[in-house]
């Protein structure tokens, strides 16, 4: 076999699937791809998590430990992306939630009259001071060049949050540049 490093995107797939463990990538952390043991989720449990998922708009006012936030971010980081783009990044807001939400609410209150003209649903939308984050103790903003990649990461992150007994709200404000 000939190695073509110019075509390698350092995804680790070749190492993960080689039945003889003959392929290694210099400088690649194989811990990310080595299966320790076969782990299978109970299909009915997975379907129940999906079936009974509800958006949370009344969050408990309790701190989310850094380790839990780390697990949620790791679930997003490990998400597959189209063409191995790996274009997803995350911004965690804790202390700045109120300030950032306040700025966004001010902007939305300015543009709402225009939105009311073109978007019927906007007419029934009330914008209060906590319109975006609903007093959530932590906000994770997901950034991705390819919107689908961000959505996939958000879904995996929701599963990690659910596993930690946390509620999730997808704000639903997607933008493109």
Per-segment meaning from a language model:
Residues 1-177:
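Acidic, surface-exposed loops and disordered segments
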